[in-house]
């Protein structure tokens, strides 16, 4: 019985992101669930900047309130706390925080810190035990988590077509901490964005899925101005940052296969030097869920920058920004406890480009023991 339960449970965990959220309150149309995990995590690598303890905790809640028969209010908050630093260091941050309204079959609208619509498709390959999902990053225009997202979603196409979902999204400007481009939540140029719009559409049928997403954001003056505001500009200058992505997945019969291809313009970060004028990003993953709780994983990820331009006085054309094979496995003891190993086999060469951009070229082995609820 335990084996059969695990075989049914694990795919649900991967989708939900939480093993079994603890129901704190459910009465009179109001519901509040608490979820979280503690990951006792250690990296082994020749790169001393990541080698060692990486332990962290995540905690969040999801709430709903029934306003009328047709209208439901909801909200979600998730926080991460690093467990590998001294107590006087402030290494914690909000991952998501948003509130919204759902109008039955009409759709839902929410606002806050959330995931960009591009992640509706690229998330299909972001399922590795520890690594993965790094041909993009957080606060990277509309490619992953970010601030100021206003999102409309329709599930099952207004209730008319099962499995057909679409979303339309707007992101407000998150600019500089000072000067003309200042906003109340100003940040470094690599994590800024101007006003942006995006959309996604996905279709799932009997385990098969196909999806596409696009986004276009204005770039800020800081992003087009320079590394030190006086001399060299960041690479990847342009009025807009654009992303076009497509993906496929299969999730049935204990098999999970997914792949996504994304082409970006002035949107993919090149280490700490700016953005690629054009980048081609590819991720593919294959996993199998054994009935006794073991889930091996194999993946390949590559991000190739095109026509990068001049960096530190050197002219670079086409360079790999990221390229690795990932081999890993997770073992689920039950719905709340798991352990994993994840080996990132870095295929990048240590050369002048990677040194200029501050890109890691070393392999990493991650070992983790996870309690989640």
From Swiss-Prot:
Superkingdom, taxonomy of origin: Bacteria
Location (main, coarse): membrane
GO molecular function, one term: porin activity
Disruption phenotype: No effect on propagation of phage Sf6. Upon infection with phage Sf6, single deletion mutant has a wild-type level of small plaques with no change in bacterial survival; double ompA-ompC deletions have about 10-fold fewer plaques, survive infection considerably better than wild-type, are infected more slowly and have fewer extracellular vesicles associated with mature bacteriophage.
Signal sequence residues: 1-21
Gene Ontology cellular component terms for the protein in this record: cell outer membrane; pore complex
Topological type in the membrane: Multi-pass membrane protein
Gene Ontology annotations of biological process type: monoatomic ion transmembrane transport
Location of this chain's protein in the cell: Cell outer membrane; Extracellular vesicle
Loop L3, as annotated region: 116-133
Ranges annotated as spanning the membrane: 34-42, 54-63, 74-84, 92-101, 107-115, 142-154, 164-171, 197-203, 208-215, 244-250, 255-262, 272-288, 294-301, 325-332, 337-344, 365-372
Keywords: Cell outer membrane, Host-virus interaction, Ion transport, Membrane, Porin, Signal, Transmembrane, Transmembrane beta strand, Transport, Virulence
Pfam families: Porin_1
Function: Forms pores that allow passive diffusion of small molecules across the outer membrane.
Summary of subunit composition and partner proteins: Homotrimer. Forms mixed heterotrimers with OmpF and with PhoE; other mixed heterotrimers are also probable.
Family: Belongs to the Gram-negative porin family.
UniProt protein name: Outer membrane protein C
Lineage: Bacteria, Pseudomonadati, Pseudomonadota, Gammaproteobacteria, Enterobacterales
């Amino acid at each position: 019985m335990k084996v059969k339960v695990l075989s049914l449970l694990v795919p649900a965990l991967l989708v939900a992101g939480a093993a079994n959220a603890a129901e704190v309150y459910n009465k009179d149309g109001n519901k509040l669930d608490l979820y979280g995990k503690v990951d006792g995590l250690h990296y082994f690598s020749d790169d001393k900047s990541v080698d060692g303890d990486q332990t962290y905790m995540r905690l969040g809640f999801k709430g709903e309130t029934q306003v009328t028969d047709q209208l439901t209010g909801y909200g979600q908050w998730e926080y991460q706390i690093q467990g590998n630093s001294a107590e006087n260091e402030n290494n914690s941050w909000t991952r998501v925080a948003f509130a919204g309204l759902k109008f039955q079959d009409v759709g839902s609208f929410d606002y806050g810190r959330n995931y960009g619509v591009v992640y509706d498709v690229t998330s299909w390959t972001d399922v590795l035990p520890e690594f993965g999902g790094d041909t993009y990053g957080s606060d990277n225009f509309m490619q992953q988590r970010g601030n100021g997202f206003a999102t409309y979603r329709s599930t099952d196409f207004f209730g008319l077509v099962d499995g057909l979902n679409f979303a339309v999204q707007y992101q407000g400007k998150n600019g500089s901490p000072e000067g003309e481009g200042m906003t109340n939540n100003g940040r470094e140029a690599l994590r800024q964005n101007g006003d942006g719009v995006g959309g996604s559409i996905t279709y799932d049928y009997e385990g098969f899925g196909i999806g596409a997403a696009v986004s276009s954001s204005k770039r800020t003056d800081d992003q087009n101005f320079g590394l030190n505001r006086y001399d060299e500009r960041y690479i990847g200058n342009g009025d807009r940052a654009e992303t076009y992505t497509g993906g496929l997945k299969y999730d049935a019969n204990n098999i999970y296969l997914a792949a996504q291809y994304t082409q970006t313009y002035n949107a993919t970060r090149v280490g700490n030097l700016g953005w690629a004028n054009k980048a081609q990003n590819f991720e593919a993953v294959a996993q199998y869920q054994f009935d006794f709780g073991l889930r091996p994983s194999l993946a390949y990820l590559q991000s190739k920058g095109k026509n990068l331009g001049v960096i530190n006085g050197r002219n670079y054309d086409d360079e790999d920004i990221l390229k690795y094979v990932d081999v890993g496995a997770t073992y689920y003891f039950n719905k709340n406890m798991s352990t994993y190993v994840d080996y990132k086999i870095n295929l990048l060469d240590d050369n002048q480009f990677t040194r200029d951009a501050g890109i890691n070229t070393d392999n990493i082995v991650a070992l983790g023991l996870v309690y989640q609820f």
